Amino acid sequence: MPHITLESHLPGITGLLEYRKETGAPIRDLTQILLRGPSTLTEAERELLATVVSHGNQCKFCTTAHAATVDLLLGESETSLKVKQDISTAPVSEKMKALLTIAALTGKGGRLVTTEIIEKAKAEGATDLEIHDTVLIAALFSLYNRYVDGMATAMPDNESYFNILADRLVNHGYSRLPQGYDHLKKQNTKP
């Protein structure tokens, strides 16, 4: 049960972002820029960064939401599963393994990211901007993870919620839906 009164049809982060829209808006804007804006990293790669950080922070809601989004973007579920199990053997490029490692370490603590780890990423072809955005995505999702779990937000009643949420994130991004979310009160599967 959440520590404060939130809309029951909006589990996880959406309920928090709707609770205080004036703080939710800049968080959504930053997320939209980082995960859907122009980048040399694909949307799936950026969602993988969010997944690995959320998994490392043991945030079930965020891990499940972003793994489902990766799965939808890639059309398969093996990659997100393998990344959560062991980055070093995941079916991604060496550059992506290096960036995922940076993200995972940032999620645990920024000072764990060493010059050696950054140099390895650069040797695998990572640009300064990709490294910058990786660290910022990891820091942002650490905020999300602590926000969701620190407020004890509810998990959805139905696991299919995450497939609907993934579809919304893939097709509409992270911006607030123009009509809001009241329409979700009428659905049995609450996204």
Model-derived segments and spans:
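Hydrophobic alpha-helical segments
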Residues: 1-191
